[in-house]
Structures are given as structure tokens and as C-alpha cells.
């Protein structure tokens, strides 16, 4: 007699399988849900048009985030101040302490007692993002890295970075070292405004140190037309961060992204929001303040000559090139003030 085996499970087996399947799906759903808030807790982004300060894109721009190695932008800002003041030169040698040499990677693996020039320190911070070099700079400028963190925070306040606190020069993990995407955009704008003579360092694609070549982590310098800065950053608590500056057709944008899941996805998102932002602004749309930052009120006599001499502004005070002749650059509102016979600028 021939025995036929059923290809179907028994009722009990099928019930058990369905129970296991439903349980597995529920577990995966819960796991996925728990991952999303973690990613969202790290993500923030902003794009600003540099000249006008117009915000073209913003997500969580004022939420507190870990800067990671974006911290080194401020370290470089303060180092550039030393160069500007003449207290240091590019050839100044900075000593390496045991504390600096002990910093965890990324690093140049400097040894205690060695020195590094200011110029090489700048390249190492921008390309290799060397943590040992950051501590060397902090100690050279303020004696200890802790004191340097206080100085960094004071400078942040002076630049309008009200939500930023620094505790070290490198961006290595510290629970109280916090910033926002908006504050980092402010720092990038201040860097180019205050130190245009040094800003070109940020477009350096590679740096050689004692026979070794270190490439810049900012891949947009090679992959996104018009990029000329500025810095990447990563620690576990922050995700992959990036501040980028890009200029196309006379329009300069500052982009900041926090919390990327990888360097590649972070860069892709930066390109996406920059592309969208470039489409929203054109060179002719950019407006800038070329005179007073508030209303100007002046009294004039009732009887006026046919023309009033208006001295041109000093070229040194103009943030942008003068417009072509006969270009409408602004307007003046006049109002008659009672019977006194004087004209006053309208408020």
C-alpha cells in the first residue's frame, strides 16, 4: 500500500509558526522604531546665503548637538587671531606635551618633547583632523586645554554663538561640549569674514607630514563644484557632521549637517539641500546692508539748494563690490515735520 505524505503542516504546527512569525515581525518593528528616534536625536541641518544671511533650509537648526571635530574650526579661528596679532608666525614652533601626545586618534602621533610649526598644525587640523595637534594649539594659546576651552566659549559668545559651549580643542567626547547647526554656520561665516587671508587653507585636499600623506576628509572639495571649505567631524554621540562653504555664480552658501549615519550619506544629504537652496536664490536676489544698520534720521533746512553733496562711502567699508552706475541701490523716505520748516527722515 502506497503512503502519501501531506505537504501541509498540521494545525498545531501552523499556529505555532504564525505565532513565531508575528512575534518576529513585532520585534523588528519595535527595533526599527527605537532606531529612528536615535537618528533623529542627532540630525540637524541649515543652509544660509552668506551675504544676506537668509536661511534657505533648516531642520532642528537650534537643537543642541555634539560638534565633534567641527570644534577645530574654533581652534583654528583663535590660532588665526594669534597670527593676525603678530604674536605668532607660520614658523612658530609649538611644543608637544605628554597630555597632547596621549590624545586618541585621529592624530599625527606626535611624541612628547617634539615641536610642530603653526603652519603644519593648521594643515594637520584641517586635513587629518589631528586631536593631538588640537591640544598642542590649545596649550600653546592658553596654557592648558581646559583654559583654552573657556577662551573658545568666550569667543563663541562674542560671535553670537549663544548656544555653544566648548570644553576641549579637538571635539573629543565631552558631555558639556555642545553647539547647534545655526551656531556652526555663524562660525563659518565669521571665519571667512574675519580671516579671508587664511580661509584658503580649508580647500587643502592633502597634507604631507614626515613622509606620509593625509587626505582631507571633506570629499565635497573634489566632488561638488564650488566647494572651498570647511570641516568634517565624527564621534559616536554626534554621528557624521559637516560644515561646507560653496560658491556658484556669485552666490555663496553655508551648509551644516549633523548626525549623518555615514560619511557618504551625510555628504549626499548636504548636496541635496545645497542643490535645493541654490535653486531658491539667484545673484540678483541678494541684498546686503552697505550703510547704516538702523534708520538714519537727519534734519535739513527748509530752503534747500538744487543739489545736495553726498560723499561716497569709503571703499574700505563696503562688504561687496560697488554696483554699476545708474543701478538703483536703495531709497530715501522724507517727511515734513509740522511747521518747524525741517525735513526729517521717516522712521
Residue ranges and their predicted role:
Residues 26-27, 50, 208, 224:
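Short, positively charged
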Residues 161-165, 169, 173-178, 182-347:
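Domain-terminus/edge residues, biased toward the C-terminal soluble/receptor-binding domains
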Residues 15, 30-33, 327:
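Cell-wall glycan-active module
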Residues 22-32:
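Bacterial N-terminal signal peptides
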